Amino acid sequence: MKILVITMAGIGDVLLATPLIHELRANFPDATIDALVRWPAGRDLLDNNPHLNRVHQQDLVQAGKPAALRYLWSLRSERYEVSINAHPQSQRLYRLAARVIGAPVRISHSYDCFGAVDRLLVNRVLPQDYTRHTVENNLDVLPLLGAGLKLPAHALELFLTPDEEKWADEFLAENRLAGQKLLGIHVGSGGTKNLRLKRWPLGHYQELVRRLNRERPELRILLFGGPEEKQDHQAILAQVPGELTREAKTRNFRQTAALMKRCHAFLSVDTALMHLAAALKIPAQIVIEAPTLNVTNWPYGHSFTLVKNPVINGRGLDYYRYDGGGIKGTREELLASMAAVSVEDVYRTLRSSI
């Protein structure tokens, strides 16, 4: 059997598909199991995964329609027998990709935006469930293949190499961070749709870091992120002592993971790095409530502390659903909702956690 797992939404969603990938291998040990991802960081997360044969990576949106179609058509030659669109790929583009690739069995969840056209693109469908985590929604597809749960437990899986672990240790040694208590912070969020609006304000992060440097000088703060966060990192670093706070300069997502693994605590909104922190079992994980957070995308299999947002107040599904669209609300409303989480609330949570 040849199976293709399509997981082309967020980078974190790739990580949320790893329990399904492991179950597929447990159920079909002799199958060829490949994955198709959108982002290079998604490929990084699946590199070295022993349950996969290959990982295909292509940004279909950036490639443009002709190039995207040519790429998907080239995958038809693989003659996959089954394709699985992992949760929560609500946009029709991903089901169209499955149809072009052409596996006879094409599995997907149905979403709020699911219609007659979608039923022409995929042929085995089950409803998504907002009361259950994305990992569990993914595992629900197994009976559609005549399969079931074979593993005694499930976890987000990332397989770092000894060289990557060594690199992280050398980074700490070179930056005089070995043996220090480390707090990782990710100031960013997804850049598609209007997901940048769920970021906690930069000014709040600046005030928080200054206060931590002043009142918790034993902590060493590492700022994680990619090119999109570079400007924010520079704004924070310009106001604080360099020996207490620094940028985690990594070349790829796997180095980021290896370095995050050394952290004692991690702070973010719901992002790919939030899911990565859960996968790495960082001892103290703190999540600021944003309008996209709901039961389906909490940190999976890992305890965390939520800094509650007085505006969102557990009503994430009123703001964001898997309907192919962005966060509901005006730019001003969403920015104000995130500004409503005070620096004092986050500092107090951090102080009690580390």
Where are these regions (language model features)?
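Catalytic machinery of carbohydrate-active enzymes
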Residues: 1-354
